[in-house]
């Protein structure tokens, strides 16, 4: 019985990502993504305001970058949301 319990605990640990990290797209195309470094739990996408449908940059961040007069930044906190 102890062996079965230990086996279940090990399987649970292996199946769960205990050190969960965010996954964010990291290219203008949404086909490629990266696992973010520890501490960077925000995905962001930067678009030029004149061409909002074309992302300029997608990446991970610890804090959301600021938008400016020329670029719009969209931040989110779920996997591949950017």
From Swiss-Prot:
Signal peptide: 1-21
Domain of life of the source: Eukaryota
Tissues expressing the protein: Expressed by the venom gland.
A GO MF term: toxin activity
SUPFAM superfamilies: Snake toxin-like (SSF57302)
Positions of disulphide bridges: 24-43, 36-60, 64-75, 76-81
Pfam families associated with the record: Toxin_cobra-type
Family: Belongs to the three-finger toxin family. Short-chain subfamily. Orphan group XV sub-subfamily.
Role according to the record: Has low cytotoxic activity.
Protein name, as recorded: Cytotoxin homolog Clbp-3
């Amino acid at each position: 019985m102890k062996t079965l319990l230990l086996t279940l605990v090990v399987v649970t640990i292996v199946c769960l990502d205990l050190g969960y990290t965010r996954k964010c797209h990291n290219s203008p195309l949404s086909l490629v993504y990266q696992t973010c470094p520890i501490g960077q739990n925000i995905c962001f996408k930067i678009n030029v305001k004149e061409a909002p449908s074309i992302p300029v940059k997608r990446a991970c961040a610890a804090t959301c970058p600021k938008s400016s007069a020329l670029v719009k930044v969209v931040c989110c906190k779920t996997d591949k949301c950017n």
